[in-house]
Amino acid sequence: MKGATLTRADLCEAVHEEVGLTRQDCAGLVERTLDLVAEALEQGETVKLSGFGVFQVRAKRARMGRNPKTGEPAEIEPRRVIGFRASQVMKARIDRALGG
């Protein structure tokens, strides 16, 4: 990884170097994996990757908020959001890597 952000291209390159598949095959593998995760979330399923974490779609209720420009009350519609909770293994790994 070159910068502070891991990209799809970085993932593809890492898979290519580790597994030895062609770059094109690695790109397809990474894309298919991400598609499977997205499809599961679209269906409202929870995606659990052991040792990594859990992606989950949650429903948020409608609520009253404020228009930041006018300060007037405004209703915020109900919506769905994606949450991620890192596993204990991942949290410990990050703590070790970042000196925490």
Curated annotation (Swiss-Prot):
It comes from the Bacteria. GO terms for biological process: DNA recombination; positive regulation of metabolic process; regulation of DNA-templated transcription; regulation of translation. Transmembrane segments: none annotated. Keywords: DNA recombination, DNA-binding, Transcription, Transcription regulation, Translation regulation. This protein is one of the two subunits of integration host factor, a specific DNA-binding protein that functions in genetic recombination as well as in transcriptional and translational control. Belongs to the bacterial histone-like protein family. Heterodimer of an alpha and a beta chain. This is Integration host factor subunit alpha. The lineage of its organism: Bacteria, Pseudomonadati, Pseudomonadota, Alphaproteobacteria, Caulobacterales.
